[in-house]
């Protein structure tokens, strides 16, 4: 999955289908050519914690999503939207999320 040319979650989902934080983090790491250990160090996480995130065993809060987005250099909106969407799906709530910047 090549994540080099995209603009927002909708663009990613058009190209790859439903996207999750887990899928995004793993695909982004792989597109950067980094091992889990290297990527975990870059994010200030343990390798086990990163593995749990990449496998979808752990959900992240919107705040943590924003922090991770800054660390890897992607728009906060992307990971925040995916984190909220993952939480809704985990709760079996059939809603979709669209974020807009507050004015």
Predicted regions and their residues:
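The alpha-helix within a helix-turn-helix
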Residues: 29, 40, 69
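Helix-turn-helix DNA-binding elements, focusing on the entry/boundary residues of the two helices
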Residues: 25, 36, 47, 62-65
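Short, basic-rich loop-to-helix N-cap that marks the start of a DNA-contacting helix
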Residues: 57-70
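Short alpha-helical DNA-recognition segment
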Residues: 33-52
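N-terminal flexible/basic segments that precede or flank functional cores
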Residues: 1-23, 27, 31-32, 72-81, ...
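Alpha-helix N-cap/N′ positions at the starts of helices
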Residues: 17-21, 45, 60
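Residue-level detection of the helix-turn-helix DNA-binding "recognition helix"
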Residues: 30, 44, 55-57, 84
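Short Asp/Glu-rich motifs
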Residues: 48, 59, 88
């Amino acid at each position: 999955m090549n994540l080099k040319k995209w603009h927002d979650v909708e663009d990613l989902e058009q190209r790859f289908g439903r996207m999750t934080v887990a899928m995004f983090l793993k695909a982004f790491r792989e597109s950067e050519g980094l091992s889990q250990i290297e990527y975990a160090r870059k994010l200030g996480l343990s390798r086990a914690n990163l593995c749990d995130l990449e496998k979808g065993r752990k959900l992240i809060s919107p705040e943590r999503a924003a922090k991770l987005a800054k660390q890897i250099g992607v728009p906060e909106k992307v990971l925040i939207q995916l984190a909220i969407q993952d939480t809704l799906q985990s709760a079996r709530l059939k809603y979709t999320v669209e974020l807009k910047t507050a004015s």
